[in-house]
Amino acid sequence: MAEIAPFKAIRPSKEHLQNFSSKSYKSYTDEELKNTLQKNPLSFLSIIHLKKNLNKFLKKSERYQLVKTKFEDLIAKKVLIKDTTPAFYIYETVQEDEHLFCGIIAGASVKDYKNNLIKKHEATITKRENTFKTYLKTVRFNAAPVLLTFPDDPIIEKAIQTAKRNAQETNTWSNENETHKIWCINNVSDINILTDVFGKISSLYIADGHHRSASSALLAAEIDTDISAQKEKAYTHFLSYLIPEKQLKIFDYNRIIKNLNGLTNEEFLDKINIMLNIQRKGTQPYYSSRKHEISMYLSGNFYSLSLRNSIKKNETAISQLDTQILQTHVLKAILGIKNERNDKRISYIKGKDSMSQIKTAIDNGDHAVGFGLFPIQIKELKSIADSGAVMPPKSTYIYPKLRSGITIYEF
């Protein structure tokens, strides 16, 4: 059964609470990064950002050590303060389309991850796993939680609401069009209740953060072989944010292709027509309205694509995914894209207004064809994870998108 653990978080002081946390580093443009750092020189970004001239000449190990030094400096300056007692942290945020997310920040068990009680739906890249493991080994903290989800459970919901009412410390702030609220749950009774109710869950599912969880597991295995490194046992868990599956918002993750692999538009349509039904939908952005329907934009027109033969009931869960159908029948068979992860002809556009963005890119002549997919449902994600299979790259774009530095897990 699932194990979660309280921990002594390192958190921004009340004075720095509003401006300390940050979005994913990669989500900032160079200009946004520059402006954010100028406006908030003591933000989490200031810890992980290295000036280009430094980044160019330092070895990875030296860059990671510099991150650790800057982190320790902010603790010394009391920008960051470590809690004195272990706690769970109930975190509530309002993000995309005024959608409210509420869950619990806790340490998730590396043992559960290794035993597949924490289930995966995405393949990881060994090089990225090892790079982040080395980073964690040097800095000894994790500031970006893995997003985990669990089946809706009224008992857990009641326990969380009770813990919120009992909390002695609550903080609220807003930044970048988002609102945030956190409750520090450090009384023993509520900690025991939350530990117990989550302990009755048979499986947790990774919604976002496959590389982070894999890297934490790699590091834990390495530390296990080094007795001198085993101080506290915090390394046996990793920073996670757990929310009920009904709260997840899964958006479409769409594809845009540079060229037609040497085919004319007519030849391309003829080849698609062998396996798929094609319906012209006009010149305005058309979004897939159901599973097994794919939207396509080509040469000024939108089309609806659907399989000529229904998916057989004995097909695997992975073969029934629209991302896999597109990969099998179009990207690989017609366009010659055998590896979506590495082929430079394919790019990805996610979320709202993505078909409009695809239309613009193709009309500008930058790309040849684009495909829109109906968002994958949580039951599909769980079915893939339960089967031990993995989805094609960029199959899901999931909210909430979690900020780094709200609670920092030190080990």
Task: Please give the residue ranges for each predicted region.
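Surface-exposed, charge/polar-rich loops and edge strands
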Residues: 1-411
